[in-house]
């Protein structure tokens, strides 16, 4: 009986550790960045770049290959202006989302292969509207009444 119990605890510990690691979201913002600064890093790209190199800048913060990411080819101030459109419901049910008035140039990067740091992406260029979640700015954010903090979806 005793040997079975000895084998149980390390397995339970391993299971609990696995559950704890699974709770760390890939999109968790890096320490020292506001949510809006992290949004800017992940989603604002006025001049289009190839997905492999653009995603390298994001993945270095998380030490993982992010599965999917959308880059908006607009300056941050233009994306922040979207926060002034009427509130709509986000995918998660929150009511702090806003949709762009018109379609914008954007690039969607989808992970095709690789393990960090050798992540490989397929890119898809589109001209579509988008939805972002907005919140009041934090210290260090640009001066806007609301700033984008989460990319919700392409519409």
Swiss-Prot record:
It is found in: Secreted. Disulfide bonds join 65-119, 83-134, 90-97. InterPro entries: RNaseA, RNaseA-like_dom_sf, RNaseA_AS, RNaseA_domain. One of its GO terms (cellular component) is extracellular space. The active site is at 43 (proton acceptor), 150 (proton donor). Substrate binds at residues 66-70, 91. Keywords: Disulfide bond, Endonuclease, Hydrolase, Nuclease, Secreted, Signal. GO terms for molecular function: endonuclease activity; nucleic acid binding; RNA nuclease activity. Its EC number is 3.1.27.-. It holds the Pfam family RnaseA. The keyword Ribosomal protein does not apply. It comes from the Eukaryota. SUPFAM superfamilies: RNase A-like. GO terms for biological process: defense response to fungus; defense response to Gram-negative bacterium; defense response to Gram-positive bacterium; innate immune response. Residues 1-28 form the signal peptide. Gene3D superfamilies: Ribonuclease A-like domain. Belongs to the pancreatic ribonuclease family. Has a low ribonuclease activity. This is Ribonuclease 8.
């Amino acid at each position: 009986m005793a040997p079975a119990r000895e084998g149980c605890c390390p397995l339970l510990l391993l299971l609990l550790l696995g559950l704890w690691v699974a709770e760390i979201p890939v999109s968790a913002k890096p320490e020292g960045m506001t949510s809006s600064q992290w949004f800017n890093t992940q989603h604002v790209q006025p001049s289009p770049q190839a997905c492999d190199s653009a995603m390298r800048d994001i993945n270095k913060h998380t030490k993982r290959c992010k599965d999917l990411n959308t880059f908006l080819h607009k300056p941050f101030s233009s994306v922040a202006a979207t926060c002034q459109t009427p509130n709509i419901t986000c995918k998660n049910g929150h009511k702090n989302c806003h949709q762009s008035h018109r379609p914008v140039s954007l690039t969607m990067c989808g992970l095709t292969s690789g393990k960090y740091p050798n992540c490989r992406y397929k890119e898809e260029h589109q001209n579509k509207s988008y939805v972002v979640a907005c919140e009041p700015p934090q210290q260090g954010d640009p001066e806007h009444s609301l700033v984008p903090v989460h990319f919700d979806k392409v519409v």
